[in-house]
């Protein structure tokens, strides 16, 4: 029997430390991190760290040995090594003062692509759509950052371009389903091929970038996510018969920028335009065509009129056909044509034209209104645009964020921006009188609910329902009393007879009543103890892991209930203070 060597099986074999992985791949730590981000490999936590680290208890980062073996065959790894040698040659040339050779080296520097990694990690398109939440969050974050020494202007410009392409597609296809304005920014949710995609767009405020952020890792993620989104957008645009990348109207981009500057053309129109350009005749060919046409006309005039069929056909062409009108008054047989849009939210504002005030953020509202089928006129853009072609008589709603408006136009509905958000979340048009300028707005709640399960609107409805049930039960009990008066009288007669019999025997009726109440209490206690015993038995039958999970679940549920109760108490206090204030205002 051979003696088994130590640290050759189990955790010691399955796991590799980070320093061992870097040594095995022969790359720097920074390149190793980049490679792991590109390939989606992350650190693992072994069950027994001491065994995995071969007896050492020093804090280390572990990876699967198979993952590191998988990285050894990556083509990007060779590109990293080539870049390392290129950097050495470049520093040597610059140190010697050989500028021409340094320029040649810089021109021939190696570059790599992440296309094959995207195809490996996302074999199907739905897999890629499910994973673009983080990609969108990262790109919108960098699009909002100012250009610094760590983040160049090209990076922010490219990120902004990809974000606008995404928003332009979502707005054109009308895919937005939910929106929530929070302290961090605006959360959007869109339905892309049956998958719910949620992302965060920060507010366009001046950013103070902290100094303790490692931008190298963030830029690596940005590089991967931008490649992923290019793939996704190309697929979405081509499937919708649109040209990718979309063209930008330079004149509008200088004035307004945003979604209105993007021109989304279909590929069929593009092909027709290119075909017409290619088939434009030259001067010589046009002369030949005119000569041949003249000869053909002369030949037609000299032809003998001997064919009667031609005459008939000519007469048939000039005859006007009778118009048949549908006299059927019953329109029930006509089938309603299905809409090209799946959700009713897509056509929510299709009949409206919105005039957005200069104090309202146009980028948020323009995206939402266009996604719901509406039209937008921005007051901020009118200063730079010619207002001759704009028809202001078609404006149905004006969005303002001011407490008082001096001049109002007749025929327009004046609303605050929250009306757009609440209509979209509820998938219907809510009453506009609650959102008039200067009015106290209803609470803007998250459409995805609270983590603790608290919903103020639902709780109010439930409380009202409980009150109604109590009233119904009281009414029902009153009716039952009226119906069963005779039965109650019979019961009273029986009780009186029992009392007389017991008094004759020398026993008090009150003592018997007390014993009946005690027996009922005992039965209740017995039932509760039985239920507790059943719970204890179930707990005994559980494994240690299940028991711990059950205790954690009970603790979390108790915390949630406590939080909900506190919120309800706060709500009651706020409603009481509001009632007091209204009473005081009424007295004044």
From Swiss-Prot:
Protein name: Pescadillo homolog
Subcellular location per the Swiss-Prot or TrEMBL entry: Nucleus, Nucleolus; Nucleus, Nucleoplasm
GO CC, any one term: PeBoW complex
CDD domains per UniProt: BRCT_pescadillo_like (cd17709)
Region (Disordered): 446-533, 559-588
Any one Pfam family match given in the protein's UniProt record, by short name: BRCT_2
InterPro entries: BRCT_dom, BRCT_dom_sf, PES
Coiled-coil positions: 512-588
Family: Belongs to the pescadillo family.
GO molecular function: large ribosomal subunit rRNA binding; ribonucleoprotein complex binding
Gene3D superfamilies tied to this protein: BRCT domain
Biological process terms in GO annotation: maturation of 5.8S rRNA from tricistronic rRNA transcript (SSU-rRNA, 5.8S rRNA, LSU-rRNA); maturation of LSU-rRNA from tricistronic rRNA transcript (SSU-rRNA, 5.8S rRNA, LSU-rRNA); maturation of SSU-rRNA from tricistronic rRNA transcript (SSU-rRNA, 5.8S rRNA, LSU-rRNA)
Subunit annotation: Component of the NOP7 complex, composed of ERB1, NOP7 and YTM1. The complex is held together by ERB1, which interacts with NOP7 via its N-terminal domain and with YTM1 via a high-affinity interaction between the seven-bladed beta-propeller domains of the 2 proteins. The NOP7 complex associates with the 66S pre-ribosome.
Residue ranges, compositional bias (Basic and acidic residues): 510-519, 576-588
Keyword Coiled coil: yes
Residue stretches of biased makeup (Acidic residues): 460-493
Main location: nucleus
Role summary: Component of the NOP7 complex, which is required for maturation of the 25S and 5.8S ribosomal RNAs and formation of the 60S ribosome.
Key words, A-Z: Coiled coil, Nucleus, Ribosome biogenesis, rRNA processing
Domain BRCT intervals: 344-437
Top-level taxon of origin: Eukaryota
This protein's encoding gene: NOP7
């Amino acid at each position: 029997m051979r003696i088994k060597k130590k640290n050759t099986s189990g955790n010691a074999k399955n796991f590799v430390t980070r320093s061992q992985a870097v040594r095995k791949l022969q790359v720097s730590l920074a390149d190793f991190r980049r490679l792991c981000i590109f390939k989606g490999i992350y650190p693992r936590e072994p069950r027994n760290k001491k065994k995995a680290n071969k007896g050492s208890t020093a804090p280390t980062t572990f990876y699967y040995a198979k993952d590191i073996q998988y990285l050894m065959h990556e083509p990007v790894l060779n590109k990293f090594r080539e870049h390392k040698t290129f950097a050495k040659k470049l520093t040597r040339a610059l140190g010697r003062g050989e500028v021409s050779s340094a320029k040649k080296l810089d021109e021939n520097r190696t570059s790599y692509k992440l296309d094959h990694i995207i195809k490996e990690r996302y074999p199907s398109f739905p897999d890629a759509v499910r994973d673009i939440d983080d990609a969108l969050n990262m790109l919108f974050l960098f699009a909002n950052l100012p250009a610094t020494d760590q983040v160049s202007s090209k990076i922010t410009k490219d990120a902004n371009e990809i974000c606008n392409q995404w928003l332009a597609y979502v707005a054109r296809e009308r895919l937005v389903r939910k929106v929530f304005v929070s302290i961090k920014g605006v959360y959007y949710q869109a339905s892309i091929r049956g998958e719910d995609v949620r992302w965060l767009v920060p507010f366009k405020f001046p950013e103070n970038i902290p100094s303790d952020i490692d931008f190298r890792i963030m830029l690596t993620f940005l590089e991967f996510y931008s490649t992923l989104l290019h793939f996704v957008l190309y697929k979405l645009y081509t499937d919708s018969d649109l040209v990718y990348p979309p063209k930008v109207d330079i004149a509008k981009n200088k004035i307004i920028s945003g979604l209105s500057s993007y021109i989304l053309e279909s590929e069929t129109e593009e092909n027709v335009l290119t075909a017409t350009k290619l088939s434009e005749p030259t001067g010589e060919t046009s002369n030949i065509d005119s000569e041949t046409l003249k000869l053909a006309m002369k030949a037609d005039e000299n032809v003998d009129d001997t064919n009667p069929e031609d005459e008939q056909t000519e007469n048939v062409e000039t005859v006007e056909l009778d118009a048949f009108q549908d006299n059927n008054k019953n329109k029930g047989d006509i089938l309603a044509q299905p809409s090209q849009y799946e959700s009713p939210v897509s056509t929510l504002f299709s009949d409206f034209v919105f005039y957005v005030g200069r104090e309202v953020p146009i980028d948020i509202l323009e995206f939402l209104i266009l996604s719901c089928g509406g039209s937008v006129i921005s007051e901020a853009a009118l200063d730079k645009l010619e207002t001759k072609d704009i028809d202001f008589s078609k404006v149905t709603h004006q969005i303002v964020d001011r407490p008082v408006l001096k001049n109002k136009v007749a025929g327009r509905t004046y609303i605050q921006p929250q009306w757009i958000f609440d209509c979209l979340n509820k998938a219907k048009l809510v009453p506009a009188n609650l959102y008039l300028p200067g009015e106290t707005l209803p609470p803007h709640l998250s459409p995805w609910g609270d983590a603790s399960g608290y919903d103020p609107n639902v709780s109010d409805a439930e409380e009202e329902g409980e009150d109604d049930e109590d009233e119904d039960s009281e009414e029902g009990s009153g009716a039952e009393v009226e119906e069963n008066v005779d039965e109650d009288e019979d019961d009273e007669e029986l009780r009186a007879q029992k009392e007389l019999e017991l008094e004759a025997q020398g026993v008090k009726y009150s003592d018997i009543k007390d014993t009946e109440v005690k027996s009922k209490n005992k039965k209740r206690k017995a039932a509760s103890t039985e239920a507790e015993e059943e719970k204890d038995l179930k707990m005994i039958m559980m494994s240690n892991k299940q028991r711990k999970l059950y205790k954690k679940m009970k603790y979390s549920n108790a915390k949630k209930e406590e939080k909900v109760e506190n919120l309800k108490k706060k709500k009651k206090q706020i409603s009481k203070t509001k009632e007091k204030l209204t009473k005081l205002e009424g007295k004044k």
